[in-house]
Amino acid sequence: SVFAFQDESTSTIAQARLFI
């Protein structure tokens, strides 16, 4: 995913951490 720095299974968590 665009903002994910881990694999896609955790991409939502990665995105949330960057956006919050």
UniProtKB/Swiss-Prot annotation:
Q: Keywords on this record?
A: Pathogenesis-related protein, Plant defense
Q: Which domain of life is it from?
A: Eukaryota
Q: What induces it?
A: By heavy metal ions.
Q: Name one GO biological process term.
A: defense response
**Which family does the UniProt entry place this protein in?**
Belongs to the BetVI family.
Name used for this protein in its record: Protein PR-L4
